[in-house]
Amino acid sequence: MGEPKIVVVDYHKGNLSSVVRGLARAGAVACTSDDPEQIRRADGLVIPGVGAFYDAIAFMRESGEADAVLDAVAAGTPLLGICLGLQLFFERGDEGVPADEGADADDDASEQAGGPWVDGLGIMRGSCTRLESSRLKVPHVGWDQVHMTPAGAADPLLAGFAEGANMYFTHSYAVADDADTADVLARTHYTRSFPCIVRHGNVWGCQFHPEKSSALGQRILKNFVSIVEGAG
């Protein structure tokens, strides 16, 4: 494979140029697209971190992007989610859900307060809920430490990553306690401990923004490009 073609999935919620530039610096041919067929044909995919859970998943379903992403994942295409992109991998979220459109969570849902819920892509088990604190400011904005699990320390996405490194976060919602621990590569603590890097098969996600996290963030993007090259 030459330079891998990575499509940044455009669900019409923000400027994606910083992600495209970061992937290009990492050695990929990167572009944005909302075309389901272009998404299916990509060597690798990135779902970026802009907007609210409900609005993003609603657009992805209506446009055919959601089915295209799931088809690509089933075919073995590497996928990276950033911030909201990570959250969309999970079974459900409650950000921005109109009260008359959401559903009650089932018995397996998070014990934390939340809902009404909207279904996510369902690639990983668990929920995404709001960070709550009477002492700390929400949203969580700024640099914070990332602590790897043993699985994370051995994962190719984190090759060369320093334990306890500071990465740049900006979010009000995070993965809840009902996530499968086998999918968690790293955690961060802000108002509560939450997974900040996850993996399930050929799907990875970062709650922080690697494209805004200096040299270590760029290393993660470069590692993802290498993963895409290896899958080709």
Feature map (PLM): residue ranges:
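Extreme N-terminal starter segment of soluble prokaryotic enzymes
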Residues: 2-7
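Two-component/phosphorelay signaling modules centered on CheY-like receiver
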Residues: 19-29
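Structural alpha-helical scaffold elements that stabilize or flank donor/cofactor-binding regions
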Residues: 38-39, 72
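An anion/phosphate-binding loop that grips the pyrophosphate of nucleotide cofactors and donors
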Residues: 42
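Amide-donor transfer/coupling interface in amidating biosynthetic enzymes
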Residues: 74, 105-109, 116, 125-232
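Cysteine-nucleophile active-site neighborhood
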Residues: 51-143
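Structural motif
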Residues: 46-48
